[in-house]
Every structure is written in structure tokens, then in C-alpha cells.
From Swiss-Prot:
Stated name of the protein: Porin thermoregulatory protein EnvY
Zinc as UniProt keyword: no
Feature: DNA-binding region: 166-187, 213-236
Gene: envY
Molecular functions (GO terms): DNA-binding transcription factor activity; sequence-specific DNA binding
Function recorded in the entry: Influences the temperature-dependent expression of several E.coli envelope proteins, most notably the porins OmpF and OmpC and the lambda receptor, LamB.
Amino acid sequence: MQLSSSEPCVVILTEKEVEVSVNNHATFTLPKNYLAAFACNNNVIELSTLNHVLITHINRNIINDYLLFLNKNLTCVKPWSRLATPVIACHSRTPEVFRLAANHSKQQPSRPCEAELTRALLFTVLSNFLEQSRFIALLMYILRSSVRDSVCRIIQSDIQHYWNLRIVASSLCLSPSLLKKKLKNENTSYSQIVTECRMRYAVQMLLMDNKNITQVAQLCGYSSTSYFISVFKAFYGLTPLNYLAKQRQKVMW
């Protein structure tokens, strides 16, 4: 029976032994109480039965948030091979949590607290695979959609790092000139993406962590506070302090 989903990733839990085939490749067996994470996009996933399988559907936002939550340097992750079968399996440590996650992943949350509960449950499901060496590479493979998104994920993995075009291009197995060309085709540029990532992070730090401007500048990878302020003003139309005052005023109203 074919496993399908509208989301880019599904994770299954086997309640009995299940035979699996992906893209008509050789069949393999998942024992009872095993988890398997599949990349769904453009892949044909066949299971011997769906009667003894629980399924969670995981969207792009959850995967992206999970990678940020892990706070790993993604430049060190070897890209997933396009020839490899897009699945990773492991023994389930928390089957009861998975059952809750499977139920919640099929529902549309009506309240913010329900959305946060679903997010936490899915993070727990994904964390079962952390000991699998290629798991992060599979998640990055699942998220591939645009070069811009790939660059964003690398920069967001360590905002403070001194990024340059060569380092980012190398981590994507591209030459700097080819990366520039691909980004131009997506109507953006490397410098624009770096600025956007840093400015979004700057706002988070200002609003949530109660840090001063110099601290925020350093956390965003700027050695010069005055330069950080000028970039912030060009991006948001306000200085960091004025932006913060405006946001606090909104809360008061």
C-alpha cells in the first residue's frame, strides 16, 4: 500500500513487522516498534500494510524550527546523496509520545497552546533519530526548495559566525560564482540574505532577551555597534531603540 502525505516528511511507527520499498528499490523490513522518517516529495513509498502503522505528518516549518532548535553548525553536515534511499529508521524509545504526536499532527489546532503542544510532540518524535549520523542531512534534503532557503538555514545555524560567500557556497557544494548566479535567478543576493537573517534575529533579541544594543550587535555578528545601528535603521526605518519603544507602545495600547 502506498504511503502518501501533503507534507514533505512523514514518520511512521510500526506496531508489527512491516515491509517497505522506496522508489521500487529493494524491499527492507522494519521490525515491530520501529520508527522510520521518510522524505515524501517525489518519492514513491510502499508499505506491506497500513493497518499496523501509526503516522505523523511533519511540515516544513516544524523541520526548519527543529534545526534552529538544535543549534548545530550546518556547514559541517555532508549533503544527502541524491542516490541514497530517503529514509532513516531507528528503534522507538517513546511509542506513547508518538501516538499523541500522530493524533495531533492530523488535527488543525484551534488555540495557540494546541499548536505549541503539537510542535513539542513532533520535536520529541524527531529527536529519536539524533543518534543516526545522516539524520540532519536528511532533514536538510527534505527542506530543499530554493537556494535562498538553504543559505538562510546555514546562516541561522550560527548568526554570530563570520560568514562569507565562499564558506556558504562550499557547504552547499557550489562554487561562489555559481551560488551568486543561483541567488540572482531567485531575485536575491548573498548579502541581502545575511542582512535579513541578522535583522530578524536582532528583533528577537531586542524584544525577548532584554539585552543592550552593543550585546545585540555582537550576537548578530557585528563588531561595530554604530554599523549595526545603521543597518538596522536602513532595514526597519527606525533605530533599534526607537523600534523597541514603538513595539512597547503597541503593547500598552
